[in-house]
């Protein structure tokens, strides 16, 4: 059986669909190489002295782990000189990073969470990198934050790498979701699954149950029904899964179905949610929809949310289509009753 590398897949997709421009193909390959380098650092762990806190905080007010900083620098260094990008934005940086004048500038914008789930680093649980690619609205002109503030429907590519028992790259360029596994001996990502599809129904949900008392009534209603099992209104038993790493939880859902929820809660009512729209929710929503699932903030499709700032937060409900639609319907019903 012929093994298909990431490069070959991208070239053949361009021939079939004419949707992957050469600059985009090269950009995706550079991001993949950066993910390989991050994977190597993650795998070395304590042997390389990269575990533990970096002693600094990021723009989100979160404590940075050493690997957060390393992963961010790897992605910046790998992508700044190739001529594919106009600018980059990261969870770990307050402002965007414009490509220095000493390098040619391209027509794309790259956003990323360099190391999602970093609270799991020291306990050796799967973590990952999430990325999103947009067109630069005004190629050749000075980049502003407004150039990044495009709805998720404008993404030209999205994906993530999960660093677990294997290093896996999951990618969409708008023609379905495809999975690549890192062959460490060959040093390349190899296509191992094509056209991933999420079952429309599920018996698994992923949510942090310790926050239940803080949720809005529609979310509590849905979870109460799941917990009631086959004796409740759903007529079936559900299992709960929660890894506290969005990459790992979403990867499980892409693999076997389920629903992932990180909803608004009343502890910080002024915030729409916890997860970041631009480089967490949007790329994951694109992947989920391309695999036949759904992704909303409880009210509207995540990909339709118009960003207002770079580090905007959003409530996230994504996964198996029928389950996501049920939770969204509960939100609409509650809003109608309040109105």
Swiss-Prot record:
One record GO biological process: fructose 6-phosphate metabolic process
Gene3D superfamilies reported in the protein's UniProt record: 3.40.190.80, Fructose-1,6-Bisphosphatase, subunit A, domain 1
Residues binding Mg(2+) 1: 91, 113, 115
GO cellular component annotations of the record: cytosol
Pathway this chain belongs to: Carbohydrate biosynthesis; gluconeogenesis
EC numbers, comma separated: 3.1.3.11
Enzymatic reactions: beta-D-fructose 1,6-bisphosphate + H2O = beta-D-fructose 6-phosphate + phosphate
Keyword Hydrolase included in the entry's annotation: yes
Keyword Metal-binding annotated: yes
Domain of life: Bacteria
Enzyme class: hydrolase
Record-linked InterPro entries: FBPase_C_dom, FBPase_class-1, FBPase_N, FBPtase
Chain sites annotated for binding Mg(2+) 2: 113, 116, 280
Cofactor binding note of this UniProt entry: Binds 2 magnesium ions per subunit.
Location in the cell: Cytoplasm
Binding locations of substrate: 116-119, 208, 274
Necessary cofactors: Mg(2+)
GO molecular function: fructose 1,6-bisphosphate 1-phosphatase activity; magnesium ion binding
One Pfam family named in its UniProt record: FBPase_C
HAMAP family: FBPase_class1
NCBIfam families xref list: PRK09293.1-1, PRK09293.1-3, PRK09293.1-4
Annotated family: Belongs to the FBPase class 1 family.
Subunit (UniProt): Homotetramer.
Protein name: Fructose-1,6-bisphosphatase class 1
């Amino acid at each position: 059986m012929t093994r298909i590398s990431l490069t070959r897949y991208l070239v053949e997709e361009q021939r079939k669909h004419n949707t992957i421009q050469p600059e985009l193909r090269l950009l995706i390959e550079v991001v993949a190489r950066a993910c390989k380098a991050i994977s190597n650092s993650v795998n070395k762990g304590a042997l390389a002295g990269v575990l533990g806190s970096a002693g600094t905080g990021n723009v989100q007010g979160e404590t940075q782990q050493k690997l957060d900083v390393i992963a961010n620098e790897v992605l910046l260094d790998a992508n700044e000189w190739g001529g594919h990008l106009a600018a980059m934005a990261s969870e770990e940086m307050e402002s965007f990073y414009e490509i220095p004048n000493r390098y040619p500038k391209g027509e794309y914008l790259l956003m990323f969470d360099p190391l999602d789930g970093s609270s799991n680093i020291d306990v050796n649980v799967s973590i990952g990198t999430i990325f999103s690619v947009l067109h630069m609205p005004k190629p050749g002109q000075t980049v502003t934050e407004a150039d990044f503030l495009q709805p998720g429907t404008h993404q030209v590519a999205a994906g993530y790498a999960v660093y677990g028992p294997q290093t896996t790259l999951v990618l969409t360029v708008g023609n379905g979701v495809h999975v690549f596994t890192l062959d460490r001996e060959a040093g390349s990502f190899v296509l191992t699954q094509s056209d991933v599809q999420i079952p429309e129904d599920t018996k698994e949900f992923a949510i942090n149950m310790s926050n239940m008392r803080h949720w809005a009534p529609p979310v509590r209603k849905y979870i109460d029904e799941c917990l009631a099992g086959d004796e409740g209104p759903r007529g079936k038993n559900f299992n709960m899964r929660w890894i506290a790493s969005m990459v790992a939880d979403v990867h499980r859902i892409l693999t076997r179905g389920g629903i992932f929820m990180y909803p608004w809660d009343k502890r910080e009512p002024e915030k729409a949610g916890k997860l970041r729209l631009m480089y967490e929710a949007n790329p994951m929503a694109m992947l989920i929809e391309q695999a036949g699932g759904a992704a909303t903030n409880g009210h509207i499709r995540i990909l339709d949310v118009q960003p207002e700032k770079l580090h905007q937060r959003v409530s996230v409900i994504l996964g198996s289509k029928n389950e996501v639609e049920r939770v969204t319907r509960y939100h609409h019903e509650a809003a109608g009753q309040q109105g």
